[in-house]
């Protein structure tokens, strides 16, 4: 099993690489790539951790050596949010980075499962899909926008509010991965109920949690460590599914039947070929139904922006 992390020298990439080095199955290969010259050194640093995970680092313009033979590619490359920016401000820089890296994936390991972390995810996943399509290698069951951070934040905030153990809570989060497109389905948590005010406040906090971190870091960065953990959780779920484990379910932003939007975050059953089944989002409360309808314009525009970027 080979996992490649692109953007491995950044805040998310280093945290993700550390978690994968300690948690990937024995005998796995982990390859780190970043344009930054420090990347081979990050790999050497991590190589001293005593786990049976082989690690190599690559830097420079060409990601090909890192991608050769990869089963899973996780992309965190790009610029991070600063105070006053929203995820869409990142578009101008990150769109080009994602296009370039996905073109290299299409040439080098076209059958790999691809997880996109680089924001704005609503748009960068659409860019990746169009690049793969142009190259003639697009499989919608193998491309994922990693929205796991919304899930782990929801789990944490609900557990805090209700005095529960966070590991006992699993909140499905649907829609997209920015602002109003993030919709935690709080009505679907077994044995936990909320007042209308709690639902409104929690939903808003989950939607704005990224900004909470950006402001708390006072210009020194964005959510890198929690995002690293979220990406590791999702990446390790992909590994377990590829190895044949059954009933591996994660919420992820994928191309589906287009009922709400071309790309939509929903619970996904993972399997040996990526998406095994897009699970139904289930029954929504009136609040959730309204929030879903209200987000769709934004989501459609985000997706269209990515499609146009590649096809203009």
UniProtKB/Swiss-Prot annotation:
GO MF annotation terms: L-malate dehydrogenase (NAD+) activity
Family of the protein in this entry: Belongs to the LDH/MDH superfamily. MDH type 1 family.
EC number: 1.1.1.37
Recorded catalytic activity of this chain's protein: (S)-malate + NAD(+) = oxaloacetate + NADH + H(+)
One Pfam family named in its UniProt record: Ldh_1_C
Annotated active site: 177
Broad enzyme group: oxidoreductase
Keyword terms of this UniProt record: NAD, Oxidoreductase, Tricarboxylic acid cycle
Listed transmembrane segments: none
Entry-linked PROSITE patterns: MDH
PANTHER family xrefs: MALATE AND LACTATE DEHYDROGENASE (PTHR11540), MALATE DEHYDROGENASE, MITOCHONDRIAL (PTHR11540:SF16)
Binding site for NAD(+): 7-13, 34, 94, 117-119, 227
GO BP terms in the entry: malate metabolic process; tricarboxylic acid cycle
Protein name: Malate dehydrogenase
Species the sequence originates in: Yersinia pestis
Residues engaged in binding substrate: 81, 87, 119, 153
Subunit structure and binding partners: Homodimer.
Domain of life (superkingdom): Bacteria
Family annotation (SUPFAM superfamilies): LDH C-terminal domain-like, NAD(P)-binding Rossmann-fold domains
InterPro entries referenced in this protein's UniProt entry, alphabetically: L-lactate/malate_DH (IPR001557), Lactate/malate_DH_C (IPR022383), Lactate/malate_DH_N (IPR001236), Lactate_DH/Glyco_Ohase_4_C (IPR015955), Malate_DH_AS (IPR001252), Malate_DH_type1 (IPR010097), Malate_DH_type1_bac (IPR023958), NAD(P)-bd_dom_sf (IPR036291)
């Amino acid at each position: 099993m080979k996992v490649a992390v692109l953007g491995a020298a950044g805040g998310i990439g280093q945290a993700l690489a550390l978690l994968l080095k300690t948690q990937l199955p024995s005998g796995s290969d982990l390859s780190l790539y970043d344009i930054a010259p420090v990347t081979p050194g990050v790999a050497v640093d991590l190589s001293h951790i005593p786990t049976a995970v082989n690690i190599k680092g690559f830097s420079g313009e060409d990601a090909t050596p890192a991608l050769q033979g990869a089963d899973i590619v996780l992309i965190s490359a790009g610029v991070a949010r600063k105070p006053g920016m929203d995820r869409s401000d990142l578009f101008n820089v990150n769109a080009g980075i994602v296009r370039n890296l996905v073109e290299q994936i299409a040439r080098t390991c076209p059958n790999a499962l691809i997880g996109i972390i680089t924001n704005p995810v609503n748009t960068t996943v659409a860019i990746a899909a169009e690049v793969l399509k142009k190259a003639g290698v697009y499989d919608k069951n193998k491309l994922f926008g990693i929205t796991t951070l919304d899930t782990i934040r929801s789990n944490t905030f609900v557990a805090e509010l209700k005095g529960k153990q966070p590991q006992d809570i699993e909140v499905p989060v649907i829609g997209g991965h920015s602002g109003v497109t993030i919709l935690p389905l709080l009505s679907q948590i077994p044995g936990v109920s909320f007042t209308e005010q709690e639902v409104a406040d929690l939903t808003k906090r989950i939607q704005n949690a990224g900004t909470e971190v950006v402001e708390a870091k006072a210009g020194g960065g964005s959510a890198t460590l929690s995002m690293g953990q979220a990406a590791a959780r999702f990446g390790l779920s992909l590994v377990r599914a590829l190895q044949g484990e059954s009933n591996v379910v994660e919420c992820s932003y994928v191309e589906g039947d287009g009922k709400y939007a071309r790309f939509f975050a929903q619970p996904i059953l993972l399997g040996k070929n990526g998406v095994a089944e897009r699970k139904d989002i289930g029954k929504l409360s009136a609040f959730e139904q309204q929030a879903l309808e209200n987000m769709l314009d934004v989501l459609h525009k985000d997706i269209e922006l990515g499609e146009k970027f590649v096809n203009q």
